């Protein structure tokens, strides 16, 4: 029986914190980390700043729970993504392996091994995955079959929605309240024939409701909340009046700052106050008085009077000019007044739209129920449906809910700031009320588009601080990722930018970043942050037509800095990352980097497969085969590299029109041109005629084949007939292009296997996907490791990079949502723009109607909240981007240097940029420049630098210095002549040709797996064929003379030494350098070979990888360097031979075998060696299975030829 240690008391935790503080460990845990790891028995909210080690804390807390007797399956651990869950599971697995290796207690070893085995069944995953488990198990309790599937295909969802919508639309158009419903549709679509805008409204309302904890209740009780509440001027929320008063006071303060300027001119030459100064003083005094005494002078009932008074008081313009510099003092106040000025008129008509909203509410409710009924009938659901089913199961079944609450010792949540209300409800139901552990950072909440609500985190933070009995807040402020240059600039920017009004959190001492180690505080002057702006004063039109995209000059600035980093400081490309706000409009980056020879890889995930050039060419080829009279597709095929017709050729063909026909397609003109019966046969010269004959002959053969063969075979026939697959291999991004073409054939094959046959149906399916603005995901290829990374800010979250470039800082934030005809809000419900008929108000008699689009009061309230929420999320996006950097951060943008000016005088301002200014500025660049202008007297830890065209010439940018790949001392490598190389190639070719006909004659009695492995390498290598040795006789060997003076250690000798070392290495001892050196003395190799072995890499394998720890944990089951022999049949000669070899290592268990093989080959990508040795490991597995009659369940390659050991499962 194991005696587990109890959980630590608060006193014991304090004692542990003291011990850690004075320990001599190189890496110490902070007091807050220790508190977060060991505190138990209450709800805990961990506010973990960027780089503070929150994942480390979670893993350590889980391990501590396990060591104190809490089984892993009694912990509920929620992660935001499947990838995060996998990484967390792997970290826990590694910790358990390490703990097993360190533990001497046998019973504890058994217990930890059981935890290791339970890890794969533990509840570590996304909320969606857990909800599926609940519904699969208990769905019967609410009438849901356990045999359901998830509708992940958006196209399938859209088809079902459209069917439901069309049916309901017809019903509502023929009901009793049809006139009101028609008015509703016209308000959004303009007429009842085009229902697309109204349909989009319904779909959006439905999707929004699905993110709430109970969609039906939200639609019934909250959907019309603001429409029912805000019907009079007195109903305006206090918060909105406060914003108006704040804008008035800000205006007074800014005006006072301007009047205090030295050049303002308060006095006339006679010494009296100037008229301008007197007027401005009156404005300042009255605005301040009205703000201070608002309740006494006006109150809510007099709000309209206040608006009139302020409008009459301030000038109609926005600016105050001092010394020819304009200061937009009144701009924000004018914007606020505009919101309130027409409220009386709006409120007069707003009541007319309420019946329309009731109709909309009814329609969305019925649509939701009907859509769900269809999905239940199909037994196919969306993720949100499954989550709501899980909530319903737990709410309606007390026994099920209590069983979960009793089962889970703790409910743990990672990335808590990105939860939505549906997920929060599910977590509440799983918890017993005092066992929640939540980790997150509100400053990194960037998933509002997924309905994530950072206020859930914020409310918990406030509640726990005010009422400690509800839970404990632990702040992890220390950053262990970034140097002080990054931390300082982050603190400087956000202390001036972020507060609860914009950003949802006050960036005070509680949230500022602190260096976690002394090494991070060592200053590096060359790592100071840079805001590099291309001066657009003389912009020569290098920017794309869409001004939101990044310009060529901006990318050139980035290329110049990267070349400087790489050449001058030796920074590897993989240490550099470019962050962008979206995946679109980034082609210019790849194009420019290719020009400068800078390797770059993107984060993937784009859906541009059907828009890639090579796929578009093939699709147009298939369209032409299907219908040659499709001129667009035919021209694309003719112009493609397969036939290479140029503009002159097409012009000559186009003139072969038949004058008797009104409509003449290009295909008919081609046929007439070939037989010389076109309108101008003299234009068809012999060369063109030959090309046309080849084209028609090829097209005819393809069309004939399309009727007989499969799509897959047709596509490969096209590749082979015109060598298109080979052609793209010579182009830029060849690997990606060939992968795309190969995937097209596979997708066509999959299409036919799904029951659909024929080229016509395949083309229709592709065209339908394109018509709906959808696409297929790009095919992933193994990206080069030594390359600059390009990814979105969202994708970068949770990652870290030495050097970070934040691109396109001048891109305006997307505000499209606040200009839609409707805006949804969780508390207020829906707000709409109402198309009111103001004919009566105007006294108009000649026109039937005068329609004006009015922003109703609920719409205005939702719009203001949405605007602030959008700006807040953009601010948090900037925080995430900046805190990815370890060493240095760059901001890249574009601005006019001549138009750059001071925004306001720095005197008398607080720590933050004025709220009005923060709302007004709509780019990262604007925020940074405003901070630099207003707080110029402070050290902001970043420099602003304008880049001119003269700085971006080819000479100024420079070029990459190519490293010397060969050792200059190795004269043999340098002086091997091309003649000898060609001779060797010829000999190899002769040998291969002979070998093709000598299989049976020279079949050896015995072969090795290494020999057989080479049979499969031709399938992996793009050029050349490598034939295995067929005979035991020695072949002629032309030995080259050794020009080098110094002997090299052969790679094969190093491989042999490694295998010997792994065979004799004692696994019962801790694996360290001393253990390895002791074992190394016992192997039979010369000193040069022993010295060449990388012992640190071997130590890293055993200490840092789960497979290495597996070796030590299960050493009793391990067999090393085991010989084998089996009988095999030669496929060519049909003769039997003996296959002999030695297996590096395998683990023999009662019911299965785990196979391991070490490789010291050099490689660029692990996938290369996986393909190369896959067949060899299959032979080993076959031998083991024949011997032990047990399956080989796992096969691993241990790759020692790279920078670090890598484990590849084959």
Swiss-Prot record:
Residues 27-483 form the UvrD-like helicase ATP-binding domain. SUPFAM superfamilies: P-loop containing nucleoside triphosphate hydrolases, Restriction endonuclease-like. The heterodimer acts as both an ATP-dependent DNA helicase and an ATP-dependent, dual-direction single-stranded exonuclease. Recognizes the chi site generating a DNA molecule suitable for the initiation of homologous recombination. The AddA nuclease domain is required for chi fragment generation; this subunit has the helicase and 3' -> 5' nuclease activities. Residues 512-798 form the UvrD-like helicase C-terminal domain. The lineage of its organism: Bacteria, Bacillati, Bacillota, Bacilli, Lactobacillales. The keyword Mitochondrion does not apply. It comes from the Bacteria. One of its GO terms (cellular component) is DNA helicase complex. Transmembrane segments: none annotated. Belongs to the helicase family. AddA subfamily. Its cofactor is Mg(2+). Its EC number is 3.1.-.-, 5.6.2.4. It catalyses: Couples ATP hydrolysis with the unwinding of duplex DNA by translocating in the 3'-5' direction; ATP + H2O = ADP + phosphate + H(+). Heterodimer of AddA and AddB/RexB. The gene is addA. Pfam families: PDDEXK_1, UvrD-helicase, UvrD_C. InterPro entries: AddA, DNA_helicase_UvrD-like_C, DNA_helicase_UvrD/REP, P-loop_NTPase, PDDEXK-like_dom_sf, PDDEXK_AddAB-type, Restrct_endonuc-II-like, UvrD-like_ATP-bd. Keywords: ATP-binding, DNA damage, DNA repair, DNA-binding, Exonuclease, Helicase, Hydrolase, Isomerase, Nuclease, Nucleotide-binding. This is ATP-dependent helicase/nuclease subunit A.
